[in-house]
C-alpha cells in the first residue's frame, strides 16, 4: 500500500525518471543496438540451420551472444559519444545528446562505456572464443579505426566505419560455428556493401551540419553528384551478393534481387532528381526497409533450407 505522500513523490519523479532513461538510451544509441541485434541473430540463426544444430539445446549460447553483442554495441556507442562531445553541439542531429546537454558527465559516460564493453566481451567469450575475438575486432574497428581515426580525417570514413557494422552477423555466426564459412562471409559482405549508400543518404541530408563540424563526409568534400555515383557503385556491388547464399532457395534469391533492383532504380533516379534532399530521404528510408526485410527473410528462408 502507498500513502498520499508516496504517490505524490512518484508523480513528481516520473517525468525525471523517464527523461533519464531516454537520455541513457540515447547515450548507448539504442536504435543502432537494435538494428545490429537483428543482424547478430541472423548470423547465429543461419549457423544453427547450416550446422543442423537445434537452437533449443543451446539457449545459453543465444543468451550470452545476444546480451554480449548488445552490451559491446551499446558500449561502443557510448564511447563514440564520449569521443565526439566536442563536435556534437555543432550538429542539430546530435546537439541533444546527454553528453552535450550535461545530463551525463564525461567520467560517467566513460565508466558506462568501459563497463558495457568489458561485461559484453565476457559474455561473448562465454558463448565461444571466436565470438569474443570478433567482438574485440568490432570494438576496435568502430572505436579506434572509425571514431578516433578516420571520421575526422578521411573522406573514406564511411567505408572504414562499414567494417564494424558488418561484424555483428559474424559474431552471431561464430558463437555457433567458430570456423565460420561461406554463409558468414556472405552476411559480412552484404552488410558491408549496404552501409555506404545508407549513410551517404544520411550525410546528404545533413551536409551543412557535417561541414560546420568539419567532418569530411563524401557529400561535403566531393559534392552530391560524386556521392550519387558512389551510392550507385555500392548498390551494384550488392546485387550479386545474395547469390552467395544459394542454400536459402530461389524464393529468397528472388526477393533479395527484387529489393536490390528496387534500390538500384531509386539510385538511378537521383541523377535526374529535382530535389536532392527529398531523393536522399527516400534513399535513406528505402535502405532501412531493405535491410530489415532482407535479414528477416534470411531468418525465414533458412528454416526451410
UniProtKB/Swiss-Prot annotation:
It holds the Pfam family UbiA. Pathway: Porphyrin-containing compound metabolism; heme O biosynthesis; heme O from protoheme: step 1/1. It catalyses: heme b + (2E,6E)-farnesyl diphosphate + H2O = Fe(II)-heme o + diphosphate. GO terms for biological process: heme O biosynthetic process. The keyword Cell wall biogenesis/degradation does not apply. Its EC number is 2.5.1.141. Keywords: Cell membrane, Heme biosynthesis, Membrane, Transferase, Transmembrane, Transmembrane helix. The keyword Signal does not apply. GO terms for molecular function: protoheme IX farnesyltransferase activity. It comes from the Bacteria. The chain crosses the membrane at residues 30-50, 59-79, 108-128, 129-149, 154-176, 180-202, 232-252, 253-273, 284-304. It is a multi-pass membrane protein. Signal peptide: none annotated. It is found in: Cell membrane. One of its GO terms (cellular component) is plasma membrane. Interacts with CtaA. Carbon 2 of the heme B porphyrin ring is defined according to the Fischer nomenclature. This is Protoheme IX farnesyltransferase 1. It comes from Lysinibacillus sphaericus (strain C3-41).
